[in-house]
Structures are given as structure tokens and as C-alpha cells.
Amino acid sequence: KKGQKLNLKTYINEILKVAKGTPVSLEVTETTAAGMIKQGKALYKMFNKVAKNVYIKIPINPAFKNSDSTHFDGIIAIKALSKAKIPTNCTLIFTPEQALLAAKAGASFVSPFAGRVDDFIRVNNKIKVDKTAYYPSIGMTKSKKVLEDNGIYSGTDLVWRCVQILRNYNFKTQ
């Protein structure tokens, strides 16, 4: 049985209605500050009227390469959108310091990404990855001299440190 065809705008509207007051993040695809700001404002204007629950998802660092000049454009975009009273969800947070920068810029939410670094290392070293790599039935194990981290410990530590920073400085960011 085939599902009905919907256009993207209709589909997003339905998600927003079903979610009611729950925040829904809509992601920008631009990678420059100016592009993310323009796209973020357009998404917010187009969709927030549906259920007043739209947050614009902005990456902390939209650069694809070290040589790109857009490393801080996410922070610039968050600051501009926050000034325009548009709530944001800052994504691709890999360090507590990035969470601090996002909060200082006015992000409504920060979203730490704990597993991406592990995934990158595993893929580059041709290590087989499946869901048991992150959620083994026995959790963390202690080998002869080293406590092996299956990704959960480092991930929870990142989240804990981000929360501590936000609380210690009384940011409204969640």
C-alpha cells in the first residue's frame, strides 16, 4: 500500500500541528552567516505561525574544510537570529566550550553530538560499526589496565559538562 503524496511544506505543517507546543527544529542548509540568517528568518516566518513551536537549527561550525572561512558563521547567525527574537537550536556541539559560545550568542538549545567523533575514527580505521558498539549488553568494561569507553561514557561526560557550564553561568539555554 502506497502512502499519500505530500509536498514538503504540507508535511512540515503537519509535524508542527501534531507536535503542538513541543519545540520542532527546522534546519538551515546554507553555510555562510548571511545565508543561514536569511534562510532561518524565512523558515521561521513561513512555519512558526502554524503552532508557535519552530526553532531554527544552526550548526556551530558550518565549515566543511579547515581552509573554509566560515568556522564562526554559526555563532554569527545564532546571535543575529536571537536578536531578531527567533529561537535557535545550535547543533554539532562537540565540546563544552562550543556550548558556551552558543549560549553566549543566544541559542535556545544546544545539541551535543557525542558519537560523531567515534564514528569518524571507526570509519577511517575500517572498524566495523553496529549498534552494539554503542550499547553493549554489559556497558563499559574494565580490561587489564584501561577502562574501555564504548562511546557512552564520553558522550554522557560531554552532556554533563555542557549542562554544568549552562547552569554555572545562568544561561537560559537548554
Describe the predicted segments one by one:
Residues 20-24, 50-54, 84-87, 106-108, ...:
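Short, well-ordered coil/turn segments that N-cap beta-strands
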Residues 64, 72-79, 87-174:
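Catalytic alpha/beta core domains of metabolic enzymes, predominantly
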Residues 1-74, 78-80:
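Active-site beta->alpha loop and helix N-cap motifs at the rims of alpha/beta catalytic domains
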